Amino acid sequence: MDNILLGPSISKHDKPKKLMVMLHGYGDNAANFIHLAEPLDQDEWGMHYVALNAPSIMPGNPMGYQWFDLYLNGVYISDVGPKEFENVRNLINENVKKISNTISLLTNDLNIEMSDCFVMGFSQGGMMAFEL
């Protein structure tokens, strides 16, 4: 289970035609973010929505998650040295693999083609979606 991510899903369809993977922002969580699916949904899309929790709990916010830490030893990410930045880059790459593994599992379970899978994200989740 360490190589996939979990989170809530919403679907109005027994056999959805498309998959929307939703990646929340820094300090948020999948349970909050999944509610954006309801106003987005159009019946004709046949969409299954799933929001994934980032793998790390945010320091100082036990209900919030992060895709990567913005503060390394109290220093903002844009001000860290090359070694620390490389560590963050490696973590981002690991988390992209987890997202990809999860998408593969979901498309297989739902019998949805990868070309019918969409990824959206907000803030840090948008950065992760871009990395895919």
Spans of features found by a protein language model:
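Serine-hydrolase catalytic machinery in alpha/beta-hydrolase-like enzymes
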Residues: L5-I112
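Active-site signature of alpha/beta-hydrolase-fold catalytic machinery across serine-
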Residues: H35, E131-L132
